[in-house]
């Protein structure tokens, strides 16, 4: 059984909106509904768990009607806490693999879901990633230090893992920017799957405007 964990518990404070960004509506759908739709259509996914804050349960319940949705789980104050809540909920389902995705990355393709899961079956863990094409610098005390671009990737989601591996990685708590970090500390090789620029994370208002433009054509994008 392959289960997608859709993280939608963030507060979206950098967006400066009245509601968390995952619940902002673009082209008739809330942001979280775009990746959710991809998971529901994907033949590689058997079930979906949506993690959100308690005060948004009713909103999510009204928007979600599908047999693949296994449940809505209350998220924590941090990303890692939300992942652990989902893993605990999933114990009764005994999934083989779980796929973790940020709902603030609305434009998820089915081919990426399938490929990340395929690579995770080979190594135990895989993540979507994108080669960096920009100049990178580190700034300290007003001094700029250039970082070589070769071998530098942006880590994206979705990320897929053996359920048992991810559960073990989180069993001692800890706070992580994403889930590949604690998994790698177990000695598990992380497979990288090439993503594309459409996998961007909606963080600022400018990102939301770009998302609106893409959303108008999303159903036509293969």
From Swiss-Prot:
GO-annotated cellular components: cytosol
Any one GO MF annotation of this record: 2-C-methyl-D-erythritol 4-phosphate cytidylyltransferase activity
Pathway assigned in UniProt: Isoprenoid biosynthesis; isopentenyl diphosphate biosynthesis via DXP pathway; isopentenyl diphosphate from 1-deoxy-D-xylulose 5-phosphate: step 2/6
Gene3D superfamilies for this protein: Spore Coat Polysaccharide Biosynthesis Protein SpsA, Chain A
EC number in record: 2.7.7.60
Keywords: Isoprene biosynthesis, Nucleotidyltransferase, Transferase
SUPFAM superfamilies per UniProt: Nucleotide-diphospho-sugar transferases
Annotated site, Transition state stabilizer, chain positions: 14, 21
Nucleotide-binding recorded as keyword: no
Site location (Positions MEP for the nucleophilic attack): 149, 201
Entries under PANTHER family matching the protein: D-RIBITOL-5-PHOSPHATE CYTIDYLYLTRANSFERASE
Function: Catalyzes the formation of 4-diphosphocytidyl-2-C-methyl-D-erythritol from CTP and 2-C-methyl-D-erythritol 4-phosphate (MEP).
Stated family: Belongs to the IspD/TarI cytidylyltransferase family. IspD subfamily.
Protein name: 2-C-methyl-D-erythritol 4-phosphate cytidylyltransferase
Name of encoding gene: ispD
């Amino acid at each position: 059984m392959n289960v997608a964990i859709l993280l939608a518990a963030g507060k979206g404070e950098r967006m400066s909106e009245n509601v968390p960004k995952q619940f902002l509506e673009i082209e008739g759908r809330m942001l979280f509904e775009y990746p959710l739709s991809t998971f529901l259509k994907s033949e590689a996914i058997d079930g979906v768990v949506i993690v959100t804050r308690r005060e948004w349960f009713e909103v999510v319940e009204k928007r979600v009607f599908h047999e693949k949705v296994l449940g809505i789980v209350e998220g924590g104050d941090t990303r890692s806490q939300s992942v652990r809540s989902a893993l605990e909920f999933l114990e009764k389902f005994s999934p083989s693999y779980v796929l973790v995705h940020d709902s603030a990355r609305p434009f998820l393709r089915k081919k990426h879901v399938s490929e990340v899961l395929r690579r995770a079956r080979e190594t135990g863990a895989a993540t979507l990633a994108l080669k960096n094409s920009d100049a990178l610098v580190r700034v300290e005390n007003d001094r700029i230090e250039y970082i070589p671009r070769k071998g530098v990737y942006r880590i994206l989601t979705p990320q897929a893992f053996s359920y048992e591996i991810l559960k073990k990685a989180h069993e001692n708590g800890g706070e992580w920017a994403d889930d590949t970090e604690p998994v790698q500390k177990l000695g598990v090789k992380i497979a990288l799957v090439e993503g594309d620029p459409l996998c961007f994370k909606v963080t600022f208002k400018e990102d939301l405007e770009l998302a609106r433009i893409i959303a108008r054509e999303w159903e036509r994008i293969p």
